[in-house]
Amino acid sequence: MKKNIFTLLILVGICLGMTSCELFGLSYAYSFKNEPGKDFDTLNCNAYEFIESRADNDLTLMYEAINRAGLKDLFEAEDYTYFILKNDQWDDYMSTAKYSCIQDIPVSELRTYILGYIVHGKYTSKDVTNPIYLESMNGVQIMRMYKTQTAPTSSQNLNSLVAGWVNPDGGVYQRGCITSNLVCTNGVVHILSSRLIIVV
């Protein structure tokens, strides 16, 4: 009897946890019928709380970078779209820039870099039927976003978002999102497949 009650409590806890940020898993949003992109259910947390909930998992360095740059308030502010980097993408950035850890990056550089991944307004894949160009929050990068409309492969989500910074020559070195349309209480989060790059 005790074993059955214990099992039932575990199952109830898992079900409740699935709606929280703490146990929310990043999933792939495939649509094989070229249907309009769909939003995930609104998460019961803001973008900062979502990242904080994964600080012990795949968003450790993103969480550290936001706090070191003093940008927590922006990730709690209303009406923004955030492109998020996982740990391996931060490792790639630090390796390229010759930093050994987040704490080595000058705060001003870190702020500029993170702000380049944020645009004002809430954009999901169904809001971007044609490519759009938006100024990033750092006032330097222009971001081009569009929705994938080709047949999916093992590494591509149909109707997911694709983004990139516009290079000085007008070209865009674009990156897909491994997860799109995570609608938080204050904006939209997209998880990039790799970091954005500008060619100078």
Where in the sequence are the language-model features?
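Bacterial Sec-dependent N-terminal signal peptides
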Residues: 2-4, 15-50
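Hydrophobic helical h-region of N-terminal Sec-dependent signal peptides
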Residues: 10-14
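Post-signal-peptide N-terminal segment of Sec-exported extracytoplasmic proteins
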Residues: 40-79
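Soluble non-cytosolic domains of exported or imported proteins
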Residues: 52-60, 84, 104-109
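FKBP-type peptidyl-prolyl cis-trans isomerase
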Residues: 62, 83-93, 179-198
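Extracellular/periplasmic catalytic domains that process cell-envelope and extracellular macromolecules
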Residues: 75-76, 135-138, 183-184
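Short active-site loop/helix that positions an aromatic residue
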Residues: 89-103
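Aromatic/histidine-rich interaction motifs
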Residues: 102-177, 198
